[in-house]
Swiss-Prot record:
GO-annotated biological processes: rRNA 5'-end processing
Key word Nucleotide-binding present: no
GO molecular function: nuclease activity
Keywords for this protein: Cytoplasm, Hydrolase, Nuclease, Ribosome biogenesis
SMART domains hit by this protein: YqgFc
Alphabetical list of Gene3D superfamilies matching this protein: YqgF/RNase H-like domain
Subcellular location: Cytoplasm
Pfam families with a match to the protein in the record: RuvX
Protein name: Putative pre-16S rRNA nuclease
Length: 155
């Protein structure tokens, strides 16, 4: 099921399972996972997209390998909260994933996560070249940590 309400998503999250997070891009997907206590997000990897079938297959494999129980996907809302065309594409992707794998999926506003990731890497002394290779997984980590903070306040 696709959730926008953190209260409803919280009810669907299996206990003692990680949460996987995706920062969707046209060419790549940043991936992060929570720990099993669902308190801390950790950047995992960047996946370079191929086609919808291969993308879904790869994401399902690492979902299982990392013992995840649910998914968070960053949703790039406009400043005024409206959905962009890219949001609609992401929602379609999420619905395909849900239909194929029956996984609880939460859409988290990802506003400014890429800017925050780039700034964090810059002040940490990471080169621009390396930063461009890893900023998507750092963005996924930021998006997931926002969600974890939100659901842990609710608990």
């Amino acid at each position: 099921m696709l959730y926008r309400d953190p209260y409803e998503f919280l009810k669907s999250i299996p206990k003692d399972k990680c949460i996987m997070c995706l920062d969707m891009g046209e060419k790549q997907i940043g991936i992060a996972f929570s720990d099993k206590t669902q308190l801390i997000a950790t950047a995992h990897s960047v996946y370079y997209r191929k086609n919808i079938s291969k993308d879904l297959g790869y994401l399902n494999r690492i979902f299982k390998k990392n013992e995840a129980g649910s998914i968070v996907i960053g949703l790039p809302l406009e400043i005024d909260g409206q959905k962009s065309e890219w949001c609609k594409t992401i929602i379609k992707f999420a619905n395909k994933m849900i239909k194929k794998y029956k996984v609880s999926t939460y859409l988290q506003d990802e506003s400014l996560s890429t800017s925050i990731a780039a700034h964090t890497l810059k002040i940490s002394g990471v080169s621009t070249t390396k930063s461009k290779r890893i900023d998507d997984k750092i963005s996924a980590c930021i998006i997931l940590q926002r969600t974890l903070d939100k659901i842990n306040v609710i608990k």
